[in-house]
Amino acid sequence: QEYRGWMDF
């Protein structure tokens, strides 16, 4: 949940 710019890991 670190790349809240393109995906939601």
Swiss-Prot record:
It is found in: Secreted. The modification Pyrrolidone carboxylic acid is found at Q1. GO terms for cellular component: extracellular region. Expressed by the skin glands. The modification Phenylalanine amide is found at F9. The keyword Secreted applies. PROSITE patterns: GASTRIN. Keywords: Amidation, Amphibian defense peptide, Hypotensive agent, Pyrrolidone carboxylic acid, Secreted. InterPro entries: Gastrin/cholecystokinin_CS. GO terms for biological process: defense response; regulation of blood pressure. Belongs to the gastrin/cholecystokinin family. Hypotensive neuropeptide. This is [Arg4]-Phyllocaerulein. It comes from Phasmahyla jandaia. The lineage of its organism: Eukaryota, Metazoa, Chordata, Craniata, Vertebrata.
